[in-house]
Every structure is written in C-alpha cells, then in structure tokens.
Amino acid sequence: MDDLLLLSEAQMRRIEPYFPLSHGVARVDDRRVLSGILFVIRNGLRWRDAPAAYGPPKTIYNRFIGWSRLGVFNRIFAELAGGSDTSDRLMIDATHLKAHRTAASLLKKGLLPRCIGRSRGGLTTKLHAVCDGSGRPIRLVLTEGQTSDYKGAAMLVDTLPPAKAMLADRGYDADWFRKALAERGIAPCIPSKINRKVQISHDRTLYRQRHRIENMFARLKDWRRIHTWYDRCAHTFLSAIAFAASFIFWLNQ
C-alpha cells in the first residue's frame, strides 16, 4: 500500500475552505476521500475499485459527483492558478482526449453539452488551455474534438491576465486573434501560416519555450482518467481535469 496517494496536511489547508461544511452525521474524513478521488483519476480505476484505505467507494464517487456539480474543483483550480496572473508570457494550445465508449454513448442526459465530437482520432474531446511562463495551466475549457484551435482561443481570450507575450503555434495565426492580443497589450509570438500573403515575423528564441505547454499536456495525460474519459457529463470530466491540474502543478509547489 506504499503507492497510495495521500494529500498532506499543508495541501489540505489550502483547499479545505472551498468545500461545503458537514451537517448532521459526521462524514468520512475529507482528506481520505479527496486522496481517493485523485488516486482513481491518476490510475484510471473504476470507482468501485478504489482502495478501501480511502473509505467506501460509493462515498468517494458520490462526494466527487456532488462537489463537481457545486463547482468546487473548478473554484479550487481558479483560485490556485489565479496567483499566476502576473506572468510576463503566456502560452495557448489544445490537445485531443479520447472518449471511452461509456462516455460516448448516444444517450444524452441533461441540458449541458457533451463536448464529444468526431475527429480523425475517432470520438474525442478537445482540451484548450492557457499556461503561464512556467508551463502551469491557468485557464481550461472543453469543446468537441473537431473544434478548431482558434474557436477555442475565442472562448479564452477575454479571460487572459496581463502579460507581455503570447506563444502559440501557427494554428492560432488569425488576424482577429492578433488584434485581440494587441488590444490587451500582449505581443503575439506566433509563426505565420504558409498561405499568409504577407508573412509576420516572430521571436524564434522566445518561441522555443512553447514546449512547456506541450509538457503540461503530457503530464496531465499521464493520469489515465484524463487521457481517456469515461464520465458522461462534460462538467464532471472538467472537474477531474481541474482537480488533477491543481494537484500536479499548484498544490505541489
């Protein structure tokens, strides 16, 4: 059992203010349950297979679903990542995440979008992210797998914090995006598309740092329930991503 994940007391102190208070019968220790949630997400387990050390699997699952619906994990991520809103450079990119057949069922429940679409990789979801200069995610959004990069950028551009430069690949080379960045005082470091009539130069030395956002996606995808998602609700999946990102990039700082 030495490989079990357990949040430290210091980590719990940083996130416990975001959870609703317990009323009535004392509930299973939050630290154990949250550690169990992270363990399931990291190892790609079914909820019923969560180790007994974390408490009853049903409790772990119900707590995750309930807190997801309340937006708890998204708030934790937003608050922890908000401390990086003074970065001098930002990076934006997107990656495909495979949808398991249990998530890709044609049966649609609820009013929220499923965020599952068909791309060259099959049924996928696309995760769009903005990172700070250290490669730590500060903004996350999900769309259908076939959504273009610049449409994802349109969903994120109004939320960008102040910065000096934005690093992005040529998939983001659109006049409207460059203009939106300039209006915010952010210099675009984006290679021009091949078919652009007048090529726009960019800082090649600075652009080499863009690998950090690729590394961020790689670290997230090491967590099996993020690499492939099984939940039928997009907001539940985004909660899993937000909590994993909070733990990997912010709670371990």
Give each language-model segment a name.
Residues 1-253:
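Short alpha-helical elements
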